């Protein structure tokens, strides 16, 4: 059994951190350990073996020295980093005593940071585009603790995510002017005021609402009331929220980002960062989504994007990497 350290160094517990938490609580083939920033340690599952450290910058000599000392004490076989910062740090202090696996969670312009790792994992094929190195795609998965919804109410369309430009909520709001359905956007972030102004400018205050990010348990209530989930991202590695909705048998329409082209037919995909294309698709399908049978898509996601399937793929990747030493 190998000893594998996962390393995250974030100021907030968001998508990447949830991904890591689910790996650490659902992977049983090897011994897993977490090194993370002390400010987010309490958000991880209490069963996880956690080493808490203070956050530090990529160029901090003292921070790297302390981390290198901790890694030597743990003596791992593999260190698995998540995101560019931790990948850069490990690449700069790595020794021959362990292998380095790095996961790319989004679509990044600068991917050279990752190429010093022994293996690069992408959450979608698009996240790995331009990587000329040992790489493998292991898609995101639907949340392992989700329970199927029994009584759907179809009260509103739903969009979920950080209120940042990359999520394309400005494009979504602008595209909503001719749609009858109400839209609920759930998320927090720096774009909130701009988005609320856009709602006012387009006279959509009666139809479009923004609600602060909620915990997973409360989000289920919004899923239960949703007729459709909309992904409007300008770019994205692999939208987890789409997998969750499809597992819960909520129809999804999306921009062509991440793994969505593996899941949805072309007619339910709009060109990314194209407001006109998004509006055309929304006007065609949002108010009539109940006429489009996505049962085959629901079944595909439940089977192919389960956490059990992805943990087996991750275990295979670890074992293959170890066999090359």
Question: What annotation goes with each model-predicted range?
Answer:
Residues 116-148:
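Donor nucleotide-sugar binding/catalytic pocket of nucleotide-sugar-dependent glycosyltransferases
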Residues 234:
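Aromatic "clamp/platform" in nucleotide-sugar-dependent glycosyltransferases that forms part
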Residues 14-22, 155, 159-178, 190-196, ...:
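A conserved mid-protein helix/loop that constitutes part of the nucleotide-sugar donor-binding site
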Residues 71, 213-214, 221-226:
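Short alpha-helical donor nucleotide-sugar binding micro-motif in glycosyltransferases
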Residues 251-254:
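Short hydrophobic beta-strand element within catalytic cores of glycosyltransferases
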Residues 267-276, 283-289:
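Conserved acidic donor-binding segment of nucleotide-sugar-dependent glycosyltransferases
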